[in-house]
């Protein structure tokens, strides 16, 4: 997609609310947005139900790629770090402290990639 943000790569880390909305807007303006989704776990749909999941997701998650990862798996965390190394920005929407517990907090990511823009959206 073309737009003023064409050529920028953004990694979206989970959550609901403002994070996916922000990622949608960046994608609409041409950024290459990669959403990190949880690997299928026991058929959970994040408590949204089929109706809400299909309607909201089809709107909010449009225009971006998705990678399924298990952020508690060392191999998948390494894959995520490799994605971040090639990114321009991060959008993080987890509860406070989650990224740090996963070993992916701002200190770790910014030490690896000092020019990274780290966007944090807290709703909790």
For each predicted feature, which ranges?
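N-terminal helix-loop segment corresponding to the beta1-alpha1 unit
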Residues: 1-123
């Amino acid at each position: 997609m073309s737009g003023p943000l064409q050529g920028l790569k953004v990694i979206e880390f989970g959550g609901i609310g403002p994070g996916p909305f922000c990622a949608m807007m960046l994608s609409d303006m041409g950024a290459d947005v990669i959403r990190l989704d949880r690997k299928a776990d026991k058929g959970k749909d994040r408590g949204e139900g089929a109706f809400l999941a299909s309607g909201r997701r089809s709107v909010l998650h449009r225009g971006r790629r998705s990678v399924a990862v298990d952020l508690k798996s060392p191999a998948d965390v390494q894959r995520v770090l490799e994605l971040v190394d090639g990114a321009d920005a991060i959008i993080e929407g987890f509860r406070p402290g989650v990224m740090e517990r996963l070993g992916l907090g701002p200190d770790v990511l910014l030490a690896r990639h000092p020019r990274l823009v780290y966007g944090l959206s807290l709703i909790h």
